[in-house]
UniProtKB/Swiss-Prot annotation:
This is Serine carboxypeptidase-like 37. It comes from Arabidopsis thaliana (Mouse-ear cress). One of its GO terms (molecular function) is serine-type carboxypeptidase activity. Belongs to the peptidase S10 family. The gene is SCPL37. The active site is at residues 215, 407, 460. Glycans are attached at residues 105, 317, 357, 375, 423, 449.
Length: 487
């Protein structure tokens, strides 16, 4: 009797297991078919009773650029691009493009780069100057820049202020106030961006950080550095130094050097200079009509010049070529390269790849927002940066100011005059420095960790005109080593 009961129990258990396995098998087939159907995408509404769980990507992971359209092979470093909000509630968004160092480690510094303007895109800095790629003449393919600054650092390119490049605001009030509060608002937005970006990329919080830029970034860079210093007790940022090229620092001193530069480079006559001095500068002989005529005569000579590099050719035909030019090299400046970049960044495929223009802005990407540039506060433009530079140096922040020697917009002599206005003690006298045995320019060191550097054969955008010199200057600065003083 007991054996019969045991057999009955055993039979029931086996029968239960058999039925359960059949149910599981059928269920598995059903699920498999659903998955297969969803992959095939027959266009019909699917069965929503089955949901595949997916891991939610972090903002950093979403910003990862898998590959740039037209990117050459052999790229080993990671790239990111995306938007970071800079106010609450979020209406202002700054766009960034970030390239990790080619050979990164946990101590590789972070460099933040700004172009000037005001309101010129730092993507110009990325793809025309110091980034890892340049754009071919067809506006579709890229080629490598072997002298990219990510040979030495992780480089973050920030499009600032808002409405520059892909950066935007959804609040019209922001745009109305920006022209009036340009410098102050921009510095605040840049700081908030950095704080929010470091939350997205926390591995860089303890890194050495440098801020760099050119032209009107002579305002952006010191002003952002000043905010960092003022707020470092609350949120520590390991700011080590600032590097500014051909910078706007003090217009009252720098502006008059333009005509002197033209005269010394054979771009105007001595008589034209004498007329200008007589009718425009002397109170006893000032004549408004004659002054205006004098200025017009001189300025007419600029029409056929690239004032950012007086020895560079000008772009005569920016028509994109179907076949990219052969033997393209960063050592040859193509005067139409801005047009190639504009065509490249306005391709929908490119914007999707770099996570830009996600809100479908009603205008195309341009290298500068000319409307904002023209409406920028004159008071801001004329504000001297000397007091901020003194403050930063007093806090132990190293400063390097470099200037191309063929820039008419901000001549090197005008920048040197600003440095002299700072009344610093010279530690090492004006002397030559070299790259590969060739003269790279001249340099002078001052007490308080300020270095001034001229760059031979470079204009307003030093990394474009002299990429090897620019990389050597940058490397020297972040390694805190002197530029080579022997050939």
């Amino acid at each position: 009797m007991v054996k019969q009961q045991d057999w009955s129990v055993t039979t029931c258990v086996l029968l239960f297991l058999f039925l359960a396995s059949q149910i599981h098998c059928r269920s598995g087939i059903h699920v498999s078919k659903r998955l297969e159907g969803s992959k095939q995408g027959d266009g019909k509404s699917g069965d929503t009773s089955f949901n595949v769980l997916r891991r939610v990507l972090s903002p950093k992971e979403k910003d990862l650029i898998k590959k740039l359209p037209g990117q050459p092979s052999g790229v080993s470093f990671r790239q990111y691009g995306g938007y970071v909000p800079v106010n609450e509630p979020s209406s202002r968004f700054l766009y960034y493009y970030f390239v990790e160092a080619i050979k990164p480690n946990t101590s590789t510094p972070l460099v933040i780069w700004f172009n000037g303007g005001p309101a010129c895109s730092s993507l110009g800095g990325a793809f025309l100057e110091l980034g890892p790629f340049r754009v071919h003449s067809g506006g579709r393919k890229l080629f490598r820049n072997p002298y990219s600054w990510n040979n030495e650092a992780n480089v973050l390119f920030l499009e600032s202020p808002v409405t520059t490049g892909f950066s935007y605001s959804s609040n019209p009030i922001d745009l109305e106030e920006l022209g009036e509060k340009g410098d102050k608002a921009t510095a605040e937005d840049n700081y908030i961006f950095l704080m929010n970006w470091l939350e997205r990329f926390p591995e860089y919080k303890g890194r050495d950080i440098y801020i760099a830029g050119q032209s009107y970034a002579g305002h952006y860079v010191p002003q952002l550095a000043q905010i960092i210093i003022h707020r470092n007790k609350k949120t520590l940022v390991n700011l080590r130094g600032i590097l500014i090229g051909n910078p706007s620092l003090l217009t009252s001193i720098q502006d008059p050097y333009g005509y002197e530069f033209m005269l010394s480079h054979g771009l105007m006559s001595q008589q034209q200079m004498d007329n200008y001095n007589q009718f425009c500068l002397r109170d006893d002989l000032y004549d408004n009509d004659k002054c205006a005529l004098s200025v017009k005569t001189i300025d007419d000579a600029k029409k056929h010049l690239d004032t950012y590099n007086i020895y560079a050719p000008v772009c005569l035909n920016s028509t994109l070529s179907r076949i990219s030019k052969k033997c393209t090299t960063v050592l040859e400046v193509d005067p139409c390269s801005k047009d190639y970049l504009k065509a490249y960044l306005n391709r929908k495929k490119v914007q999707k790849a770099i996570h830009a223009n996600t809100t479908k802005l009603p205008y195309e990407w341009t290298s500068c927002n000319n409307e904002l540039t023209e409406n920028w506060s004159e008071n801001d433009r004329d504000t001297p940066m000397i007091p901020i530079l003194h403050e930063l140096m007093g806090e132990g922040v190293r400063v390097m100011i470099y200037n191309g020697d063929v820039d008419l917009e901000i001549p090197f002599a005008s920048t040197l005059a600003v440095v002299k206005e700072m009344n610093l003690t010279v530690v090492k006298e004006f002397r030559p420095w070299f790259t590969g045995g060739q003269l790279g320019g001249f340099t002078e060191d001052y007490k308080g960790n300020l270095t001034f550097v001229t760059v031979k054969g470079a204009g307003h955008s030093v990394p474009t005109d002299q990429p090897i010199h620019a990389l050597n200057i940058f490397t020297s600065f972040i390694r805190n080593t002197p530029l080579p003083h022997t050939a």
